């Protein structure tokens, strides 16, 4: 039924995955090889409905559904509405549907269209921001500027869909670490997402970034540099509304969690503890 590899956010570990698309609509980020083996494809509405029907026959109760692969929001609005309506009919007990959404796929949809998706059960959009620094965004071939990232996230917020964003520590290398941390903190402050996750750069063979490292065109941060960068990122986050923060992904050297703004100082104190004790995850245990 599934076309592997298959990815989903850690928080969707108990969700039924319906693979409405294959691959990623952008698939050009220099650091990512998740979908390099796939040609991006949007499945037909008929095929998606058949898969939904199939899962109904094997699962008696499904509370959460995640639409895969890497950018299900790119599906044309009419088909996406039909998918959500069909899920409601086949899985009436389902309380939330979530998906990845690229900045460009969000920008292609109006606030009114996003509001319609919200009414039909779309609870959360996961979006990779990676960085708030325009030079870094250009370097990693993200395909959007920081202004476009802000515009996309504001549309999600206005539609009342829950927004979960991720950024990547170390993605700017040593040369751009400071600007990456400061400007990423600033963009998070402006966006005020519902959830913020920090991952740490993993070196994936076959990616453009990996080749840059081999050619000594990119200097990788060590574990202590990463802590300094995350600390600087947190120092530059200034929000009024609650932002649930997680830095506990398997790629990270340390585990942090809290809620901005109330836990900001505690998080900084915890980083200081890690810096003083050097009690960091060993490289061999880091993974995506």
Feature map (PLM): residue ranges:
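Auxiliary Fe-S-binding modules of radical SAM enzymes
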Residues: 2-12, 186-288
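Conserved, mostly hydrophobic/aromatic
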Residues: 24, 32, 48, 67, ...
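Canonical Radical SAM [4Fe-4S] cluster-binding loop centered on the CxxxCxxC motif
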Residues: 4-47
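Catalytic cores of alpha/beta
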Residues: 112-114, 172-190
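Aromatic/hydrophobic pocket-lining residues that form the small-molecule binding cavity
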Residues: 48, 80, 110, 149, ...
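Hydrophobic faces of well-ordered beta-strands that scaffold small-molecule active sites
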Residues: 16-18, 63-65, 95-101, 125-127, ...
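Conserved strand-turn element in the central/C-terminal portion of the radical SAM core barrel
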Residues: 104, 132-136, 156-180, 199-205, ...
